[in-house]
């Protein structure tokens, strides 16, 4: 159970990081 929760959290944070990177890249392109 614990390991499953940790992996789920890692996947969520990873997807969030990728989304943030995309937003940052888009912001740099528009500037």
From Swiss-Prot:
Record keyword NADP present: no
Main location: nucleus
Subcellular locations according to the entry: Nucleus; Chromosome
Keyword S-adenosyl-L-methionine appears in the UniProt entry: no
A GO biological process held by the record: nucleosome assembly
Any GO MF annotation of the entry: DNA binding
Gene3D superfamilies: Winged helix-like DNA-binding domain superfamily/Winged helix DNA-binding domain
UniProtKB keywords: Chromosome, DNA-binding, Nucleus
GO CC annotations on file: nucleosome; nucleus
Pfam families found in the cross-reference section: Linker_histone
Family membership noted in the UniProt record: Belongs to the histone H1/H5 family.
General function of this protein: Histones H1 are necessary for the condensation of nucleosome chains into higher-order structures.
Protein name, per record: Histone H1.3
Organism: Triticum aestivum
């Amino acid at each position: 159970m614990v390991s499953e929760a940790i992996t789920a959290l890692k996947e969520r944070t990873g997807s969030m990081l990728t989304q943030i990177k995309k937003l940052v890249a888009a912001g740099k392109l528009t500037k």
